């Protein structure tokens, strides 16, 4: 038992010990003791288990003993509960750079980068290997056969025919026999015999010269494809233009100077050597200049370097830290008076001052000129200006030899020559003489008859000539001819040939290509020093120099006490000049200097003979006629080599030939040319030259078209000038005239210089003549190259020369006509055979030979030189339409459109908010009638009373009888016009009416008569009338919900209406109740006569309203009463329900023409009309002036000719048929079109149906669409002059250009002008009338750059510019000085006097500006003086009859209105949450607009903007609108990852960060308005809209926006009282983050917005909120609290 007790004690002790560490130890111990001892268990044994053997004395309790020693340490207790989180520590120091992190996820795709700069041109590559032989080309078509040429000239005389047969034997003569007759002496030569009979046709003469090329024939059918032709000769090119100069190379070290003696023999230039080995490294260069200070931010602190070597002992350290604080010193003297403090902050706003005195405003003074705008971009090259006035006469030009001009036109045929002298008579018996000189050519014979048509064989002999073909178009130039034979070998002679006589001066040649570099010349004498060149670019930095020897250790420096930073020193003296820079690149060519004065005559010295020149090219053959253009026949076979011709006259020097192949040098001793001697004196004048030969006759000009016959003139009076005829077709060329070449005439006197020409086209100008050699000038700066001038006008013909010496033998003339048959010759013996005759005329061209066989492939020719630069090609045809381009980036926001037409009636809206409590109502209307009283006694018949009040509306009667069926309803007479009613409230918009019928197409106009002549340009017309309004703009954005209006005052009751129509007599009523008994009963009397009317009784009291009677039977319809008098206007009625659409009415008579109304609201765009018929062809323009002759073409198609003078503008054609392109994007708003004319009257409406039940007329139908505009009325008479006010009116809008004036009378004929140069493009013609709207095309290419717009308004002040470059160092002397203390601030100066008012500036040009912002509400002005009475207006159209309304009683006085004065000065900020600017509420002027800034983050700290305050509406947007500055007076911009956050619009979320213009549609716009009182937001915390307090009105309703966070843990919030906490629209992502440094914006994933939620009132203090995730927009909105912004209005 004891053991159990001990065990229990131990257990309890252990339990108590283990629990004693807790706070409940006492209780547990007591509990445990009770558990042991108090368990109620009895121990069995004596004394209850106690030891009773010993006496138990209970002594008294002793006093408390001393405290025991401390017990041993207890065991460690269990871990305590975690404590609360401590406060955040201070921000730690910047840690070491961490290891590079893992690669992040791929970021969003960045925007496309800016295209790089174009790379430098590469080094030209080596020539490529020759390509493989190309495939044979396609077979060409046979060319069409040319027209037969003109008949050749008459052939030369054929050789004499064979002798004729012997004649018949003559009669025998008489025999005379004389004896002894001696033979007589030979008699005189007999007379020439009679001409013999014509001989037989001689053999064919030699072939005549080639005829002129015929006109091209009609295009024949394409021939069979020919075989492939032989390979052509390699083309001959021209050396290409010199390339751009290369980059300047590094400056080489100077080479050794060698003087080379001239060699004894010809030197040859060797081949280029191989590239040398790299040179040795040069000496170190001089030290470079100090570089410019770098740009960029200071870098991050670098990584600690390795420990350096032990340094020298340092100098004395700086003073130590200040010591401990000393003891309190003695009291000092009172200080001096302080300096005047700076100007204080501006004081609070004062009370409004009294209203100012109204002064008549003076004329507006012009403000000071604004800041200069930024320079605009260079405009495009302007149009060519008009020709300047004629310049002064220039000096006579010097004649220089130029190139041979093109062949002149064929001259007119010469006159027939004089008959030759008679020849010596021939002897019949002599041998035939030598052939005589060819006779002069005879006159041309008459043209032969037209031959028969030829046969159609392709290869055949020449057929008979065909009939005259129609004149063909000018054919293309022929291709390049075959390569000519190789010329004769040139002579090699070391001596130059004798100098030929000088040729006549040629025309100026074109500028030759740049020649090769000449041999190096001798060193010239030292020239005068040139002017200083332009400053070259800085040289490249020098290489690092070799390290110098270590310097000696410097002396120990003085100890510097001051630690104040000194001021910036002054600029030091200029350093020594730097090393010369690298040579600059070539400057551009300078302007040509003016012609210098002639120099003084040079000293004469014998010139050393110059070196031998290269052999000159052979001159062209002398005076042959001009070569005709190439013919169209096939090339003939090469002829045999002819005999060498007679040497011709020395030809004019031809143009420089192409550079030949490298020649073989013939070894001969060549001496280096000596130096040029000084110019010799002028020689004596040479003898007078022989007269020059007369030029060959030119081709004949083409005849013009025959003009139209003029009107027959009268005998004396000259008729009016006739119409100008069209230019005729060119006539056929006449026969070539003959005339011997005349002697050359003397040179003509120099002509007067022509006027200065318009600058010519640089591609076609000629090189001017070389000037006389002037003195060597100082080399000028090379100017830009000028444009070559036009050739001068042709000088007048020279004085005719003296008769020249006998000319050389003329050329062989053309064959003459066959002579008249001569008399028969004497019979004589057959002569000896004659000398062979001259070659015959050339025969007709033979048929083309058969195509030859394919030749052997030719060797690859050497590469030809580059061809000349081609002439500009013709403009290509317009390309096919490309596919539609990608949509462009959104354009900038356009101006506000015109107000759109009212939209159709929308569906019924949600019920509105409960209105504000109304004012106390007026007394109610009369009550219902009381119960029926007892019947009274029957009274006497009263006199008729006054007209009673209008009875209550009777009950609806029974349906009437069926009316008769009207066959044709006649139109009633129109009623008298009622007075116009007051304007009702605007009704709901009716449904859109049916569109009108399509108008008929108009007839095409006829041609007008031709004008007499081109009129002078009319003067500028008066500005036209303003056009009609343009088409409606696109629908504007939805406006703000309007504020609920104030309750209107109760309207006055209307006046009583006119009497109604007489009612139909009712049926007899039922029998009345029985009356009371009478006092006396008399017998009934006979029926009396009707009594006379009694006097009117007194007014009885108004009886109570009777009960409505029982409905009587339907009476017969009454006649219409007379029209009532018009009552006063009634109050506007409530809006009726829209009536059913009525049947269309009959067509009314056309009304009188109304005055021109104000421009209406633009109607909706009409249905696209049908395509117009194609317009008639316009009249032919006047024939342009004849263009100058073009240069010969190099290829098949010549260059485009110069642009002719534009013809007169043709009549305007009708619109063409519509294009087939799909509609393009909507164009910009076009200019208003002219008003349409009235359409034809519509067809008569359908006959109405027969009425069965005549219902009450329905309410009026909806208003139909507006009709077409009527034609413009005639302008009214001029109005009366207006009164002259003190204020000057604003300048009117710029007028439209007036119509062109009528043609003026014909001017006098002008003098013949010199031929002008090619004209430039004409100026832009006047703008035509706007055509009808065409179909939408594809999006066009970007338009030309527009004209510069008007200068914009002055922009806001820009951001501070970057810090300027450091100034030049100041001059300092050697003594450093401690800077002085800053001076005391000066006293504030007195206020300057007001300046004198400036002169009034001139009125600025320009059209009327845009309307300015609304000004603040001004004080009521003094009433103006009454204006002059206007003239009586025209009668208006008949108005609709107004309904008569009864006049109401006078209402109670209204509440006191706002007096004039200012608003309260409170600011209200509206954020649209779209990209459109919000509008201010009614009566609140707008102060500015801008972009909605939510908050900024800089240095990872956020700064919030309250959206209800004006600071959240920044006028200008920037992704980083701030910079940060530090104590070192340095500011940094865009150097850290700072951000800005802006309220966003409703644009769809983008996939990539936005940049530049793409950001604009995503930023919300805002406006700051001036409000009369402070606006307050109220929040409901549920789905209902909270009401505004009494006497407050609503501004807008929205959703409760609470706070936001962005990058990191930074963000901000809105005060719930602020209007910024009530956003009109809920967005889960309501703001946009812009990364300032990158200039991009995006909706990033770590942005959160916080909104007040809805809370049910019964769950305010209940269980924890249930978590929820809302993904649908509607569910999100239902969870967000609603709010309303209110402002006090009374």
Swiss-Prot record:
UniProt-annotated glycosylation sites, renumbered to this chain: 142, 669
InterPro entries linked: Collagen (IPR008160), Collagen_IV_NC (IPR001442), Collagen_IV_NC_sf (IPR036954), Collagen_superfamily (IPR050149), CTDL_fold (IPR016187)
GO term, biological process aspect, one: glomerular basement membrane development
GO molecular function: extracellular matrix structural constituent; extracellular matrix structural constituent conferring tensile strength; molecular adaptor activity
Site (Cleavage): 1206-1207
Motif (Cell attachment site): 94-96, 145-147, 189-191, 310-312, 724-726, 785-787, 989-991, 1212-1214
Biased composition (Gly residues): 149-164, 199-208, 849-858
Residue ranges annotated for the Collagen IV NC1 domain, each copy included: 1465-1690
Region span, 7S domain: 39-64
Function of the molecule: Type IV collagen is the major structural component of glomerular basement membranes (GBM), forming a 'chicken-wire' meshwork together with laminins, proteoglycans and entactin/nidogen.
Disease as annotated in the protein's UniProt record: Alport syndrome 2, autosomal recessive: A syndrome characterized by progressive glomerulonephritis, glomerular basement membrane defects, renal failure, sensorineural deafness and specific eye abnormalities (lenticonous and macular flecks). The disorder shows considerable heterogeneity in that families differ in the age of end-stage renal disease and the occurrence of deafness. Hematuria, benign familial, 1: An autosomal dominant condition characterized by non-progressive isolated microscopic hematuria that does not result in renal failure. It is characterized pathologically by thinning of the glomerular basement membrane.
Official protein name in the record: Collagen alpha-4(IV) chain
Lineage of the species this protein comes from: Eukaryota, Metazoa, Chordata, Craniata, Vertebrata
